[in-house]
């Protein structure tokens, strides 16, 4: 399995002949190396409804026929407002089997709304995501602040990789993300959600260097991947 990083919180997981795209903020994202019109994933997974995470989901899903996995409120909105047909609605605490493995949604402390036709639309609770693929557990924290139940996430799902936001202002900053890494006890921690905008400018290498002894961290450059 290969996991690659594409700026902000966009990651791509390739397992066998299946491609999973997470939070595909591509258009308008100078830090992303992908082109929306070239993406043909089998699945799109969304952590929440903010525009910098839903991103190009509608265009990509319509072009590819991808199944979109997300919280049920966001799923309803995308189906009714944007005409998406292949939806897999879930909610926090639930898990579901797919052809590639299992998805479980966890809590995240953040918001989840958009503005459509001049009105503010709330799009359900933001989530984190635990993927179980090829007997590996990958935690994608989404946008969140630090919370103590991250310890429980790590206990219930021994983690091979954890993707954590470090941008501060809208999510955890580096200091809290380092605590989150200690709570989660993942084999590898990868920072995300930084340097896309001035308000979330951070040094990811400094974050990795700050991790407690025994916690491995890796900065993925745009387009770079890891094999697990």
Swiss-Prot record:
Keywords carried by this UniProt record: Hydrolase
SUPFAM superfamilies, sorted: Metallo-hydrolase/oxidoreductase
GO MF annotation terms: hydrolase activity
Alphabetical list of Pfam families matching this protein: Lactamase_B_2
Signal sequence region: none
Top-level taxon: Bacteria
Family per record: Belongs to the UPF0173 family.
Protein's UniProt name: UPF0173 metal-dependent hydrolase lmo1577
Species this protein is from: Listeria monocytogenes serovar 1/2a (strain ATCC BAA-679 / EGD-e)
């Amino acid at each position: 399995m290969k996991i690659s990083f594409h700026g902000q919180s966009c990651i791509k997981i390739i397992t066998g002949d299946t491609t999973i795209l997470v939070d595909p903020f591509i258009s308008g994202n100078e830090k992303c190396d992908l082109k929306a019109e070239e993406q043909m994933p089998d699945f799109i997974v969304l952590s929440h409804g903010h525009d910098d995470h839903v991103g190009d989901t509608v265009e990509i899903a319509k072009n590819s026929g991808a199944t979109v996995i997300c919280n049920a409120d966001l799923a309803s909105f995308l189906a009714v407002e944007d005409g998406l047909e292949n939806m897999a609605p879930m909610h926090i605490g639930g898990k579901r089997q797919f052809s590639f493995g299992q998805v479980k949604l966890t809590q995240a402390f953040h918001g989840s709304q958009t503005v459509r036709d001049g009105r503010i639309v709330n799009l359900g609770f933001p989530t984190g995501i635990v993927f179980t693929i090829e007997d590996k557990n990958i935690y994608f924290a989404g946008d969140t602040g630090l919370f103590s139940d991250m310890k429980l996430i790590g206990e219930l799902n021994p983690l091979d990789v954890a993707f954590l936001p470090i941008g501060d202002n809208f999510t955890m900053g580096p200091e809290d993300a380092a605590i989150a890494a200690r709570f989660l006890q993942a084999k590898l921690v990868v920072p995300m959600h930084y340097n896309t905008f001035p308000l979330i400018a951070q040094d990811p290498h400094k974050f990795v260097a700050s991790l407690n002894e025994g916690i491995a961290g890796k900065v993925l450059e745009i387009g770079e991947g890891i094999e697990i």
